[in-house]
Amino acid sequence: MTFTAPLQKDAIRIMLLGSGELGKEVAIEAQRLGIEVIAVDKYENAPAHLVANRSYAIDMQDKSAVLELIEKEQPSYILPEVEAISISALFEAEKRGFHVIPNAEAVNKTMNRKNIRVFAAETLDLKTSGYEFVTTLDGLKAAGERIGFPCVIKPVMSSSGHGQSIAKTANDIERSWEIAKEARGDASELIVEEFVPFDYEITLLTVRNETGTTFCEPIGHVQKDGDFILSWQPMQMSPEALKKAQEIAKAVTDGLGGRGIFGVEFFVKDEEVYFSELSPRPHDTGMVTLITQSQSEFALHVRAVLGLPLDFTFYGAGACGAYKAKNESHNPVLEIPDDAFTKDSFVRVFGKPESHVGRRMAVSLVLDEVKEAKRRATEIVETIDDH
């Protein structure tokens, strides 16, 4: 591959649409290769803004604003990092010859739970939980009765667990409706899912490039209110279940096409593997790879996009704990004990300009056998404070 100098007319440019903590790590990996980075988000001083060559704060759901910026910057690759983006702008950008990663149609299918569920279950005939889509409270009540209780209720468009809830009985339906409607994102339509009494859930990081499809070690995770609080790698699972997960992940990512990393989520019950969701980009649970792999999910994503060789050397088991702010602040300060930083552990601070209760501000990372790594990652998170 030929590497040009950044800030020159012939520079290789990556535009990040979404500049949170995941985008920040992608930007850092691109910078290590001398790639020019343009970071875009809806607010100033987002994490990836701090490590980019140029940054912008725009309404990413405004088609005209997105296209105007793309034409101005002329990126070699456009990397959507969040769901709240004008999909029509991405389709138009492709028509104009710009390269969207993995492609605009894949982003369209995966940014919307309805699109990806219908694609997986009905087009690809993959095993999923039962589901219905509703747009009214009466429709939600009826769907709950048909699906059965408990059931999981989510907006078709939201991220990081926003708007998700479990209705244990019919009496919970109105509360779930209100939770969904108060979430950020588009809550005009909801998905009602059968609750699968799973043994565990995993993320299978799946990487596509010109040479084929490769998988990282499976990642186990625990979620609270739909957002991860702890992840670890590897997740111990039977060879049969892992093979099924890999086959499903390959089928769905082959169906989407393009290159880069995909975070494919599954529920596992006994030996049954249920497809859940998919993100066509690095996954929050995959931050554990910052300490467990020779090339993190972010490095793999950038290298796959550029067509560079990939390395999947696994250093050893590890865990990642999410620290969420306890306070509101326009100038957040994190207090982290020194013993969080050792030869086998560290904390990544995202540098977000504001905090609010429940906002993810940092992660702890520990390299150790799984049980001890999970304990230590959780312990470190519990010792952090903010003000």
UniProtKB/Swiss-Prot annotation:
Pathway: Purine metabolism; IMP biosynthesis via de novo pathway; N(2)-formyl-N(1)-(5-phospho-D-ribosyl)glycinamide from N(1)-(5-phospho-D-ribosyl)glycinamide (formate route): step 1/1. ATP binds at residues 113, 154, 159-164, 193-196, 201. SUPFAM superfamilies: Glutathione synthetase ATP-binding domain-like, PreATP-grasp domain, Rudiment single hybrid motif. One of its GO terms (molecular function) is phosphoribosylglycinamide formyltransferase activity. GO terms for cellular component: cytosol. It comes from the Bacteria. Its EC number is 6.3.1.21. It holds the Pfam family RS_preATP-grasp-like. It is an enzyme of class 6 (ligase). Gene3D superfamilies: 3.40.50.20, ATP-grasp fold, A domain, ATP-grasp fold, B domain. Mg(2+) binds at residues 265, 277. N(1)-(5-phospho-beta-D-ribosyl)glycinamide binds at residues 21-22, 81, 284, 352, 359-360. Keywords: ATP-binding, Ligase, Magnesium, Metal-binding, Nucleotide-binding, Purine biosynthesis. The keyword Endoplasmic reticulum does not apply. Residues 118-306 form the ATP-grasp domain. Homodimer. This is Formate-dependent phosphoribosylglycinamide formyltransferase.
